Swiss-Prot record:
Belongs to the aspartate/ornithine carbamoyltransferase superfamily. OTCase family. Pathway: Amino-acid biosynthesis; L-arginine biosynthesis; L-arginine from L-ornithine and carbamoyl phosphate: step 1/3. Pfam families: OTCace (PF00185), OTCace_N (PF02729). It comes from Neisseria gonorrhoeae. Keywords: Amino-acid biosynthesis, Arginine biosynthesis, Cytoplasm, Transferase. This is Ornithine carbamoyltransferase. It comes from the Bacteria. Reversibly catalyzes the transfer of the carbamoyl group from carbamoyl phosphate (CP) to the N(epsilon) atom of ornithine (ORN) to produce L-citrulline. The keyword Transferase applies.
Length: 331
């Protein structure tokens, strides 16, 4: 299967077999790193990392993955990038494409990363946009594969919370593409767009995936092996929306009771992080003082329980991002 020089913009661009090939390569690279026998396949390559949104996991994953594989990288922080401000996306793409072997972009509009890919002449990787988070999806799929004990097409998972943005969109597409039993539990006003839902149903017709969207969180999690969530207020949204969002989503909080509603004593909890699960951050303390919530989308009890596999998930960001880069650029 040829993934050489491929852009990695959204899972809709790939077949189930191609997505599985990325997962297989990630598992192979992970094993090699842990065994101390990793072979550098990207020596002499240069990668530009464009971040219009700040990042911990995505940046670190790209940096470490590139370094492990012998590639050099340039980090363009939010304040340093001229993209779309003093220089058009098209021009930025053509400049960086002359200097670098690949470009990673983390920012706002999906259209921006698509335009970079159109004009760069080198592979472009989507580190996150408002609409999609494809590298996170590979990490999530690898993590579920490691913990499931059965093939992904025999695995059920649910996403509960605000499903309008990149995580809800991407998990719905991931499940559809890989033939999984995927459920979205959210108020209907916070479901993915009609276009995303239609794309998921189209993929499911090809793969045999089962898709459920429901406003009942308990119905969504019944029988699943994994429960995913994300923050209720996204980066850049004003503090004023917190009360409205808490009122809307209070029944979708991942509590021990919701975990138990799965009926599966082995159910696992997943979160792309960062998570508001206690008062140990400035935002977490502000939420507690303002709304009386110790933990928002997930309780501390669930987050810190043996069911929580969020740090396996976070580690797998690096291995799966490495797989994307090696597949595109590796010798």
């Amino acid at each position: 299967m040829n993934l050489k020089n491929r852009h990695f913009l959204k899972l809709l661009d790939f077949t189930p077999e191609e997505i599985t090939a990325y997962l297989d390569l990630a598992a192979e690279l992970k094993d090699a790193k842990k065994a101390g026998r990793e072979i550098q396949r990207m020596k002499g390559k240069n990668i530009a990392l464009i971040f219009e949104k700040t990042s911990t996991r995505t940046r670190c994953a790209f940096e470490v993955a590139a370094r492990d594989q012998g590639a050099d990288r340039t980090y363009l922080e939010p304040s340093a990038s001229q993209i779309g401000h003093k220089e058009s996306i098209k021009d930025t793409a053509r400049v960086l494409g002359r200097m670098y072997d690949a470009i990673e972009y983390r920012g706002f509009a999906q259209e921006t990363v698509e335009e970079l890919a159109k004009y760069a002449g080198v592979p472009v990787f989507n580190g996150l946009t408002n609409e999609f988070h494809p590298t996170q999806m590979l990490a999530d799929a690898l993590t579920m594969r490691e913990h499931s004990g059965k093939p992904l097409n025999q695995t059920a998972f649910a996403y509960v919370g605000d499903a309008r943005y990149n995580m809800g969109n991407s998990l719905l597409i991931l499940g559809a593409k890989l033939g999984m039993d995927v459920r979205i539990g959210a108020p209907q006003s916070l479901w993915p767009s009609e276009g995303i839902i239609a794309a998921a149903h189209a993929a499911a017709k090809e793969t045999g995936a089962k898709i459920t969207l429901t406003e009942n969180a308990h119905e969504a999690v019944k029988g699943v092996g994994f429960i995913h969530t994300d923050v209720w207020v996204s980066m850049g949204e004003p503090k004023e929306v917190w009360q409205e969002r808490i009122d809307l989503l209070k029944d979708y909080r991942v509590t021990p009771e919701l975990m138990a509603a799965s009926g599966n004593p082995q159910v696992k909890f997943m979160h792309c992080l960062p998570a508001f699960h206690n008062r140990e951050t400035k935002v977490g303390e502000w939420i507690y003082e303002t709304f009386g919530l110790n933990g928002v989308e997930v309780t501390e009890e669930v987050f810190e329980s043996p069911a929580g596999i969020v740090f396996d998930q976070a580690e797998n960001r690096m291995h799966t991002i490495k797989a994307v880069m090696v597949a595109a650029l590796g010798d």
